[in-house]
A protein has these predicted regions:
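A cross-kingdom signal targeting lumenal/periplasmic-facing segments of multi-pass membrane
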Residues: 93-168, 172-182
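Activation targets extended, charge/polar-rich intrinsically disordered C-terminal tails
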Residues: 152-348, 352-362, 366-412
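Glycine-rich catalytic cores of cysteine/serine-nucleophile enzymes that process amide/ester linkages
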Residues: 50-129
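Boundary at the C-terminal end of the N-terminal hydrophobic targeting segment
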Residues: 41-45
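Bacterial N-terminal signal peptides that target proteins for export
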Residues: 3-8, 18-29
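Bacterial N-terminal signal peptides
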Residues: 28-37
Length: 415
């Protein structure tokens, strides 16, 4: 096999800038070393396969948003010549062109790369993250098939893939590299009953309330359906547990398990100090107080109405854009009935009619949409802060319908 230098250079280039600085010396040495190393050529038979060890590596979560669910890699270790590499399908860079819009639209490309095992462990040790190795009990023929697939994967034209959080990520790629090239079927334990994509990620983002809230807002109806065993393996810990209990060709798939790095105790930061629920209750309380003033005085404040429409419309733009996103489980989202871009279409009309205290059909339209959104919660989980804000907006719509004068009634029109 040929772990070519081009792949390794690409790997170094694609790492975030701080990691590049930390690994710069390591990669220079590695590239020089690999210039004289040749593994087994693609056109020649693979030999000494019995001395090769294939392992699944599972890494514990980190502090960054993209690391909160852990990571998976594959280890290739040739005990005869000492070659020891980690095959990593989770390489990306936030510095690439148009990264943010591409990420929002689900058009982010990830890369597959190879690095020395010592460098891989050094990085995770620096981040205080744990690494567990599961050595696979597979035949020589299985190893040959995996190595052939790896030779194909590592070609420069094959290293890039379109990332999909639930269906095609670093964990599913590592699994497929192994399982899809075994000569016998892997028998996994029974799938988790009633496990949905949303419920599974809640186990990992629960300590980060704003991350959990943001993801719950963006995930739609399809995130709440029951998942299959294969779908449940998008999470590194799930795949590790399944491998541990899997049967292959009459024996355990995993021959032995080793803790290569013990995770360090990390201080978890939940981001913004005020939890989403408290923030929602605070904003809803302000809106309720203003609505009470509206009702008692039978007079609305166009500035507050404008503020609500602009904020909800801006949030609605995000949900509207997600309709066209390639991200899984985001295109069909009932929350768009609560927050959508329609307020911008009615903004000028609302300002004019609120200043004249006239009836505005927008409040009826919005009230109907919000009501339909609450009906949609039967099919989709909606986080409590979003429901609180939606209920607050519904009350605001009702107050307007109660106090606004019909357009035909004007001061001095009666004779």
């Amino acid at each position: 096999m040929n772990f070519n230098r081009l792949s390794l250079r690409s790997h170094a280039f694609l790492l975030p800038l701080p990691q590049i600085m930390k690994r710069k010396v390591l990669y220079i040495v590695l590239i020089c070393l690999l210039s004289v190393l040749q593994m087994i050529a693609v056109a020649r038979p693979i030999s000494n396969t019995d001395s090769i060890q294939i392992s699944l590596l599972t890494c514990s979560p980190g502090q960054e948003v993209w690391a909160q669910y852990g990571h998976t890699a594959v280890r290739y270790w040739n005990k005869t010549n000492g070659e020891d590499f980690a095959i990593n399908y989770g390489i990306f860079s936030p510095n690439q062109s148009y990264f943010i819009p591409r990420f929002i639209l689900g058009l982010t490309d990830y890369h597959m790369g190879v690095e020395p095992m010592s460098s891989f462990l050094a990085q995770y040790n620096y981040e205080g993250r744990g690494v567990v190795e599961q050595v696979l009990d597979i035949s020589i023929e299985d190893k040959e098939a995996i190595l052939r697939a790896l030779e194909e994967n590592i070609k420069p034209e094959n290293t890039v893939y379109r990332y999909n959080f639930f269906y095609d990520n670093c964990t599913t790629r590592a699994r497929d590299l192994i399982v899809n090239h075994l000569h016998h079927k892997v028998i996994y334990p029974k799938a988790q009953e009633d496990a949905t994509f949303r419920s599974m990620i809640h186990k990992w983002n629960h300590s980060f309330p704003w991350t959990e809230f943001g993801e719950d807002l963006l995930l739609g109806v399809n995130a709440d359906r029951k998942t299959t065993k294969s779908e449940q393996q998008f999470l590194p810990e799930n795949l590790k547990n399944d491998f541990e209990k899997a049967i292959y060709n009459g024996h355990w798939l995993v021959k032995s398990t080793h803790v290569l790095l013990v995770p360090k105790q990390m201080t978890q930061t939940s981001g913004f100090p005020i939890p989403p629920l408290i923030m929602a209750l605070f904003l809803a309380s302000i809106n309720l107080i203003i609505d009470i003033i509206y009702y008692r005085k039978h007079q609305a404040c166009w500035i507050w109405d404008t503020t609500l429409l602009v904020l909800s419309g801006a949030l609605g733009l995000i949900f509207f854009i997600m309709i066209f996103s390639q991200h899984p489980c985001v295109s069909l989202n009932t929350i768009i009935l609560f927050f959508n871009p329609l307020p911008f279409l009615f903004l000028y009309k609302t300002i004019q009619k609120s200043r004249r205290q006239e009836y505005n059909s927008w409040w009826l339209i919005w009230g109907i949409l919000i009501t339909l959104g609450f009906i949609g919660t039967i099919f989709q989980y909606v986080p409590s802060p979003a429901r609180i804000m939606a209920l607050s907006l519904l009350i605001h719509c009702i107050i307007h319908l109660l106090i606004d004068k019909p357009t035909s009634i004007r001061p001095g029109s009666n004779k």
